[in-house]
Amino acid sequence: MPVIESAIQRVRLTKKQHDRNEPQLSAYRTAVKKFEKAAAAGTDNLAELYKAASSAIDHAYSKGLIKKNKASREKSRLAKYVK
């Protein structure tokens, strides 16, 4: 356990940030996996799932969970399947 007060505060803050970020990251990953699974199966609602995955990627980027280039790369990679 940290002894210095600023270190104690950082531990508290890090836990708070983790508790906030983890569900958002999970939702982003789940949306992408759902789309990839549907694309592999060849289902017909790919456009709808792409929209949800793209929205989840944008949300993760706007919250600072992923970087701009990763967001663009993910969306581009998923867009190949929609055509």
From Swiss-Prot:
Key word ATP-binding present: no
Gene: rpsT
Recorded superkingdom: Bacteria
Name under which the protein is recorded: Small ribosomal subunit protein bS20
Cellular component terms (Gene Ontology): cytosol; small ribosomal subunit
Family under the similarity heading: Belongs to the bacterial ribosomal protein bS20 family.
Disulphide bonds in the chain: none
HAMAP family in UniProt: Ribosomal_bS20
